[in-house]
């Protein structure tokens, strides 16, 4: 336990530590002491466990031993990366004063706070993934949500209307750190989220938020950003911005605007849909065999991040989509020359963020210079394009000749990692720096001349002049000649076989050289900071250029993918419907060793629902998912895996595909399935694309069939959504006879004895059978079990012929168990009767008795 009440009982150094720690009680404090960052007390115990480092003790303070752990300053980034990956935050406390001139403890100050959502150091970040800080506010009328990518300055807000929409946003953005008010009611919404930070209520106050935002953007109000009335979003944005400023301990000039995201601007997908379509993460949590895995061949990290944002937020803006399609077509002839140039641009977006935070390192500026050298070649390659959008992009890319020349003059070709050791500023950039460096560099020549002169004066041929970091410059002689030294030689150090001396002239030169080195280093650091001041006025244009270059990377990547994977340009139509010829699943096609069987699809006003039947493993789920992925690709502006595609207006994509128990929330497979189904039935519209796969299979046959039937009726009749409805309930294949706009299709299969061949080909009409037993045999179910199953199947088919269709036909079905009918007396008597124990006379008597009971 730390005694913080009586600070006087502690040593001066520990008093300083405890005061700083009191300002950051909930996070680890890295306290700089010489070449180490030290942690004390509970921080030391926690850090030793988290980072697997030794826990020691540092004497005592206030009569108590002090637990201590430490990490070397030169390896601190590795330890920070480990802590951040574990969701920890760290306050970095540096020595500000000079130990040589300070009496008592050297002055220290927390210079930055490293948190999972506010990282900018490349060593701590996944370069091909956004790293977002988010804030959430809940009110009776909905939610406010804000996200900030501090590595780009991208600041977005939205107002999800309900819990499902908020959950979808959290799943889409996947923030590294999430701020929430201490009064948040729905804690279940965020309970499994990483990097949770509970914040006081006052940080979400509306007036404070407005003040924070107008101050940041230098405006009188927020009308120009379209968020003045978005009060829920404003609360979240205000808290987020305050937190970012507190952690960075500097201004944030690269955050220059906030954008309100509106639901109607993009295709809405809920959390289940994003998960089931495996856009950037597969169902196992990895990145392999996802849509992004197939599509992402971008050559810059910032391009890769932009592509993933497009995949998670397809746009409905027809102008934007047309521009992208035209650009992809135009770039197909230039991909081979353009991509190597873009690769050399690198991650300009994050370099600029570090510039804005004044944490850019020498190699960041060298990368920026190298990026600028590629711009003229990019401009020359793409100039003169006839399509309208590429010239706009090139205009935003710019060339920055002045800045390129500045960095070429200022920074050496291959600078060191850090500026603190010097050797960053190029010779010729600053005359005074060159002069101080010349003094330090001329030491070798001077020492050679001095050594030669002293040898001649003394006649001692073994005399040498040298230098070491501890004792400075010296004249060295062997022990055997030490009695011959002149009287003005002053002994500095005695070694086993030699003596070292200093003379006034050498001492004077030593002082001069050491002074020149320290002055050169101080001047170099000042010149390096001055470079920031020269670059920062161009930050807005540089950010615009980085965004344009990232988009150019995405478009050229999509051009390469279209060419390599034989994708075609879809038509985005204002008329309702989806028409696809030769459609293919982009991921399955990519991983298959044999040719993929392409299939058509037509949905229109007269054909709004497809009832899809066919065998397990026949390709029903693949067919449904490929439709959703083709639509999604069309709405990011990409070409699509098909021979031809025309896509009408789409507002939402829903999937009810597969399910598993949600043990963490205590929900069964069937409950998960029904929750997702309810969400679809409440929120789908006539412009929605709905995929329903095997609904109702998690309960009894008749319950499941009834639910599937009623759901299909609602989607086709009331909602009129464009629906692909896969089922094994063959009773549903009678729906087209009862409802307009419903059509049967099936996936073909051919049986050969006990084996089955899946044709993966979509045909009109219903499937003739399910082939479930053939699939079971393929899976290795024992032969005797399959044989018995075939016998039982024949019995069941005989018993239930025609029964199921009648049981589900009707305008409305109750989801509740019907009231149980009382058993008739005659039936009860018959059940209790043993006919084998009756004589012929008794049997006749029982027959008359039963007749009376009816």
Curated annotation (Swiss-Prot):
GO cellular component entries: cytosol
GO molecular function: ATP binding; ATP-dependent DNA damage sensor activity; damaged DNA binding; mismatched DNA binding
Protein's organism: Sodalis glossinidius (strain morsitans)
SMART domains, per the entry: MUTSac, MUTSd
InterPro entries: DNA_mismatch_repair_MutS (IPR005748), DNA_mismatch_repair_MutS-lik_N (IPR007695), DNA_mismatch_repair_MutS/MSH (IPR017261), DNA_mismatch_repair_MutS_C (IPR000432), DNA_mismatch_repair_MutS_clamp (IPR007861), DNA_mismatch_repair_MutS_core (IPR007696), DNA_mismatch_repair_MutS_N (IPR016151), DNA_mismatch_repair_MutS_sf (IPR036187)
Primary role: This protein is involved in the repair of mismatches in DNA. It is possible that it carries out the mismatch recognition step. This protein has a weak ATPase activity.
Protein name: DNA mismatch repair protein MutS
This protein's UniProt keywords: ATP-binding, DNA damage, DNA repair, DNA-binding, Nucleotide-binding
Binding site for ATP: 614-621
GO terms classed as biological process: mismatch repair
A Pfam family hit: MutS_III
NCBIfam families: mutS1 (TIGR01070), PRK05399.1 (NF003810)
Family according to the record: Belongs to the DNA mismatch repair MutS family.
């Amino acid at each position: 336990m730390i005694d913080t009440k009586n600070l006087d009982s502690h040593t001066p150094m520990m008093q300083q530590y405890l005061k700083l720690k009191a300002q950051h009680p909930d996070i680890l404090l890295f306290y700089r002491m010489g070449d180490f960052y030290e942690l004390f007390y509970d921080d030391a115990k926690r850090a030793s466990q988290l980072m697997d480092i030794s826990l020691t003790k540092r004497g005592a303070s206030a009569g108590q031993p002090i637990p201590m752990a430490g990490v070397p300053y030169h390896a601190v980034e590795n330890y920070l990366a480990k802590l951040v990956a574990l969701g920890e935050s760290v306050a970095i406390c540096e020595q500000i004063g000079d130990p040589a001139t300070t009496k008592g403890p050297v002055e220290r100050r927390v210079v930055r706070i490293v948190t999972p959502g506010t990282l900018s150091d490349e060593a701590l970040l996944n370069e091909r993934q956004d790293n977002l800080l988010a804030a959430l506010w809940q009110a009776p009328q909905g939610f406010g949500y804000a996200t900030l990518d501090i590595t780009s300055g991208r600041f977005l807000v939205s107002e999800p209307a309900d819990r499902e929409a908020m959950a979808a946003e959290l799943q889409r953005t996947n923030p590294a750190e999430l701020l929430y008010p201490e009064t948040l009611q729905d804690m279940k919404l965020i309970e499994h989220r990483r990097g949770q930070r509970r914040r006081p209520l006052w940080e979400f106050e509306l007036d404070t938020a407005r003040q924070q935002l107008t101050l940041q953007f230098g405006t009188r109000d927020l009308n120009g950003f379209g968020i003045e009335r978005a009060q829920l979003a404003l609360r979240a944005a205000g808290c987020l911005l305050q937190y970012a400023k507190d952690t960075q301990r500097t201004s944030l000039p690269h955050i220059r605007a906030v954008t309100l995201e509106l639901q109607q601007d993009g295709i809405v997908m809920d959390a289940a849909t994003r998960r089931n379509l495996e856009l950037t993460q597969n169902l196992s949590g990895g990145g392999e065999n996802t849509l992004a895995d197939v599509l992402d061949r971008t050559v810059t990290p910032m391009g890769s991040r932009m592509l993933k944002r497009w995949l998670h937020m397809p746009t409905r803006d027809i102008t934007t989509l047309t521009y992208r399609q035209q650009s992809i077509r135009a770039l197909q002839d230039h991909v081979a020359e353009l991509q190597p140039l873009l690769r050399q641009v690198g991650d300009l977006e994050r370099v600029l963020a570090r510039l804005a935070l004044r944490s850019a390192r020498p190699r960041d500026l060298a990368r920026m210079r190298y990026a600028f050298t590629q711009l003229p070649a990019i401009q020359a390659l793409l100039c003169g394009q006839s399509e309208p959008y590429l010239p706009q992009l090139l205009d935003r890319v710019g060339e920055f000749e002045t800045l390129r020349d500045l960095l070429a003059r200022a920074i050496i070709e291959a600078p060191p990692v850090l500026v603190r050791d010097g050797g960053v500023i190029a010779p010729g950039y600053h005359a005074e720096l060159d002069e101080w460096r010349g003094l330090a560099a001329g030491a070798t020549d001077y020492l050679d001349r001095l050594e030669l002169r002293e040898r001649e004066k003394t006649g001692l041929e073994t005399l040498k002049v040298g230098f070491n970091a501890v004792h400075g410059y010296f004249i060295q002689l062997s022990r055997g000649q030490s009695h011959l030294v002149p009287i003005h030689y002053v002994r500095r150090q005695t070694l086993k076989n030699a003596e070292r001396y200093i003379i006034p002239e050498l001492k004077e030169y030593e002082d001069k050289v050491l002074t020149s080195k320290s002055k050169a280093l101080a001047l170099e650091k000042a010149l390096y900071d001055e470079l920031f001041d020269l670059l920062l006025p161009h930050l807005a244009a540089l950010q615009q250029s980085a965004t344009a270059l990232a988009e150019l990377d995405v478009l050229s990547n999509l051009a390469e993918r279209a060419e390599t994977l034989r994708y075609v340009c879809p038509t985005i139509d204002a008329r309702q419907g989806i028409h696809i010829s030769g459609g293919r699943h982009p991921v399955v096609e990519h991983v298959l060793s044999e040719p993929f069987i392409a299939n058509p699809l037509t949905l229109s006003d007269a054909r709004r629902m497809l009832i899809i039947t066919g065998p397990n493993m026949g390709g029903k789920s693949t067919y449904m998912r490929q439709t959703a992925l083709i639509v999604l690709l069309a709405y990011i502006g990409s070409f699509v895996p098909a021979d031809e595609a025309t896509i009408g207006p789409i507002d939402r994509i829903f999937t009810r595909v597969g399910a598993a128990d949600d043990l963490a929330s205590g929900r069964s497979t069937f409950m998960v399935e029904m929750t997702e189904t309810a969400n679809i039935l409440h929120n789908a519209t006539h412009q929605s694309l709905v995929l329903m796969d095997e609904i109702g299979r998690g309960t009894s046959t008749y319950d499941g069939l009834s639910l599937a039937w009623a759901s299909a009726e609602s989607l086709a009749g009331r909602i009129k959504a464009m629906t692909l409805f896969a089922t094994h309930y063959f009773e549903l294949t009678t729906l087209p006879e009862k409802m307009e706009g419903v059509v049967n299709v099936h996936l073909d299969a051919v049986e050969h004895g006990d084996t089955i061949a899946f044709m993966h080909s979509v045909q009109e009409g219903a499937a003739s059978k399910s082939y479930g037993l053939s699939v079971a045999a393929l899976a290795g179910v024992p032969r005797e079990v399959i044989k018995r199953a075939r016998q039982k199947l024949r019995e069941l088919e005989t018993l239930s012929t025609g029964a199921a269709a009648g049981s589900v036909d009707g305008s409305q079905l109750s989801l509740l168990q019907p009231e149980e009918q009382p058993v008739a007396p005659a039936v009860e008597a018959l059940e209790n009767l043993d006919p084998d124990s009756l004589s012929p006379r008794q049997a006749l008597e029982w027959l008359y008795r039963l007749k009376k009971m009816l």
